[in-house]
């Protein structure tokens, strides 16, 4: 029987193989039903699934992926990170239907990623004073109309950080989607804000 921990380790290993992108990983997962089954059957994938080549089989033979996965699992456990697969009820339903939806999402915090009202804010890193005012005004007015709105941005310089701060100042839930993972916060100046976001939203 596949234990949840063993399956998570296999998913992390699959995620670590650079030559297997999210679309191909998702396809293999859907065909075989679990990451462990992908690795168990790697020698016979050509017979089981159409479109598999030797390069993919060789990539799955990389034992280094499991070493990295075990290190990553320790970090996940030590930092109380949640790992969501597409089958998990908390996995964002809007993302699940995308062709390149990742097999794993790593989250911290208490945000509901399936809440009805989500507004994503993107903008320049070099915001003008006018841009700052308008961003603050937009989020303040959104909150007054929809108190349960979730503000999503990237926790980067400029409009990202301004939108997160405006959300926190208005008691809005806010989520930062990090390009580099949960093992670091960049820019460093946003670390304190990221900690606040864990109490009123979260990080992905």
What are these regions (language model features)?
Residues 1-89:
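Short, small/acidic-rich helices and loops at N termini and domain boundaries
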Residues 2-5, 85-204:
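Glycine-biased, small-residue-rich flexible motifs in mid-sequence functional cores and linkers
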């Amino acid at each position: 029987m596949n234990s949840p921990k063993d399956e998570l380790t296999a998913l992390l290993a699959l995620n670590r193989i650079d030559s297997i992108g999210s679309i191909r990983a998702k396809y293999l997962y859907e065909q075989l039903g679990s990451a462990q089954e992908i690795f168990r059957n790697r020698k016979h994938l050509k017979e089981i699934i159409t479109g598999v080549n030797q390069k993919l089989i060789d990539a799955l033979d990389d034992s280094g992926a499991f070493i990295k996965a075990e290190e990553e699992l320790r970090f996940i456990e030590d930092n109380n990170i949640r790992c969501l697969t597409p089958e998990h009820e908390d996995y964002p339903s809007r993302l699940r239907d995308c062709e390149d939806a990742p097999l794993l999402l790593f989250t911290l915090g208490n945000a509901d990623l399936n809440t009805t009202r989500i507004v994503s804010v993107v903008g320049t890193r070099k915001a003008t004073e006018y841009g700052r005012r308008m961003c603050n005004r937009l989020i303040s007015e959104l909150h007054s109309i929809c108190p349960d709105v979730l503000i999503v941005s990237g926790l980067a310089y400029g409009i990202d950080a301004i939108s997160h701060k405006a959300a926190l100042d208005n008691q809005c839930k806010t989520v930062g989607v990090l390009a580099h993972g949960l093992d670091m916060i960049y820019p460093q100046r946003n670390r304190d804000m990221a900690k606040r976001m864990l109490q009123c939203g979260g990080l992905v």
